[in-house]
Amino acid sequence: MGKIKKKGTSGQAKNYITRTQAVRKLQISLPDFRRLCIFKGIYPREPRNKKKASKTSTPNTTFYYTKDIQYLLHEPLLRKFREQKAVAKKIARSLGRGEVGDAARLEKNHAPKLTLDHVIKERYPTFIDALRDLDDALSLLFLFANLPSTAHVPPKTIALCQRLCHEFQHYLITTNSLRKSFLSIKGIYYQATIQGQDILWLVPYRFVQRVNGDVDYRIMATFVDFYTTLLGFVNFRLYSSIGLRYPPKFDTRSDENGAELAAFTLEGRGVGDAPKAIEAGNTQATTSTNNKEVSKEIQAKVDNVIKSAGLDEAKEEPAAETTEESSETIDKFEPAAPEADTLPQPDLSGNEAGSLFAPFTFYISREAPRAPLEFILRAFGCKRIGWDAVLGDGAFTHDETDTRITHQIVDRPQLPESSLPAIPAASKDGSDAVQKVKPGTRIPGRTYVQPQWVWDCINEGRLVRPDLYAPGATLPPHLSPWVKPSRGGYDPKASLAEQEEEGEAELDEDSDEEMEEATSDKKAEAKADVGSESEDEDESVDGGMDVAGTDDDESESEDEEEDFDGFEEEAASESEDEEEAARTQHQKELEAEAAGLPFSSNGATSDGSKKKASQAKKIAAKKRKEEEELERQKMMMSRKKRKLLEKMIYSNKKQSEEAAKLRSKRRKLEKGAAK
């Protein structure tokens, strides 16, 4: 007979451990335990049965894997936490004795500093692993870079986050790795491709942030400590991969004047070259630039060698041209059949992204968001960006009347000239040397666009029409570049004629007309009811007492209460009505012919209604036929496949209904705009 197993020695009770037991086992405080778990990437787990996992009668709420806690026993950070606890006791003892100087000395010189380098190496064995986990790090660091300094968020933390974020942005600008961006309610989404990994992060808008007290900034500060170390490692590796020195030179005075990205100076090879991606595997660009620098003498010798060898130049040149074209352009994948799935197309390469805004000179007005526009324009090849001196240093020009400016980004409404302020007078000391332009004026030879034009251009991968984004114009919808239209769904970019079903527009018009007629009938009935009520009030006598009805009223009520005689009388009455309508229509046609006038009023409407009715019948018959065919096909299926098909049909029907609602809404908006 086997031994009876003791409770809590196997199963879930052995695999899981409560948080209280873990804190006792590690001999640290609960805040230090939280920090240690965040640094090491250990999170609470949910057992299948909490009663079995718990060794006590009450089911606990927080559980961890026992192996994870066993793994934490050998962590070097535990020693640092214990040293911090010992120093904190000494500082408290000194403050209790009134020795403030000793307490300050202990805090400054003897407080142990945590280093997370070994934690980063343990959690991310390869650089690709670090890139995959960079989304949350960038989102949190960009958030703290835009927060105001408070007691919970010190200025040093904000400055560190700003410096790391600007360094990462400089790498994206140098290598043209930024691919897409989207303006949302939460903030601005960015997507970059680094070594084949897509990185997506969120940057908040630069509004005045109100720090609430319900946010636990201690937990967030722990994540910031970890992510700053991670981003420092990543930036060093990225800068080293393209031959740049890290960290780059930082001008404090320029940063205080609002230069931001311009406060950094990159040093190393490849900084002054053309705006192309500088990567180890990108050897085609370097070979092409080296070939252009070959002297004429060497080229002549090569030509002589080719002629002496008897090679056909005519055959070699087109081959070279085709190889160059294939290396510069991106292949487009087309579906084999029109009903096949849409194939995902490749994104822009670094060279194409670096030349999108390269030939232009931009000027950012004061009301436009300078920081995101500068980052996007520089990441897509623009080298000359100017703005007003109020926005900070680092601009290509502060003169709005510069003739080299080709595009100006404006985000203000169109106002009449009478309401515009006058040009401010220049100062006497001559410090205001730059000429001021009257607000709202247009300088010839320049394209004025709204900020959305920049985002739509980079998402489309080409320059879109700037007249659609003129100042004061109604902007086209700003769509997410990551949401692709599915088959049968609503596509806001396509026209209604391309995506609506057969007869959908006519049916929608008929339903709208019926709704309008119903509302007009309701209004007429309401007016008639009001009139009848007023007549009843006038006819009421004897203080509202009931008056006996006459014999005529009784006979009318008896006639109304006659028995139902069946559908034959209704059919006969309908046929009589149709004959009467045809007779009256023929009579009107004869009268119009005798008067010499064209008969088109009632005839056209009746013909149109007949056509619509016949078309609706055809569509209904077609749908009925398709449903019958589908039912016959379902009869040949097994029960499992039939259930799966019904689920698919249900989901597709829901999607088509939502798409039809959106198309109907768009149809009404277009009609209203046309009127």
Curated annotation (Swiss-Prot):
Gene Ontology cellular-component terms listed: nucleoplasm; PeBoW complex; preribosome, large subunit precursor
A Pfam cross-reference name: Pescadillo_N
Biased composition (Basic and acidic residues): 519-530, 581-591, 624-634
Coiled coil start-end: 551-675
Subcellular location: Nucleus, Nucleolus; Nucleus, Nucleoplasm
InterPro entries documented for this protein: BRCT_dom, BRCT_dom_sf, PES
Region listing for Disordered, in residue ranges: 309-331, 475-675
Paired cysteines (S-S): none
Domain BRCT stretches: 352-471
Biased composition range(s): Basic residues: 611-623
Predominant place of localization: nucleus
A molecular function (GO) term: ribonucleoprotein complex binding
Acidic residues: bias regions: 498-518, 532-541, 549-580
Keywords, alphabetical: Coiled coil, Nucleus, Ribosome biogenesis, rRNA processing
GO biological process, one term: maturation of 5.8S rRNA from tricistronic rRNA transcript (SSU-rRNA, 5.8S rRNA, LSU-rRNA)
Sequence similarity: Belongs to the pescadillo family.
Subunit structure: Component of the NOP7 complex, composed of erb1, nop7 and ytm1. The complex is held together by erb1, which interacts with nop7 via its N-terminal domain and with ytm1 via a high-affinity interaction between the seven-bladed beta-propeller domains of the 2 proteins. The NOP7 complex associates with the 66S pre-ribosome.
Its job: Component of the NOP7 complex, which is required for maturation of the 25S and 5.8S ribosomal RNAs and formation of the 60S ribosome.
Protein name, as recorded: Pescadillo homolog
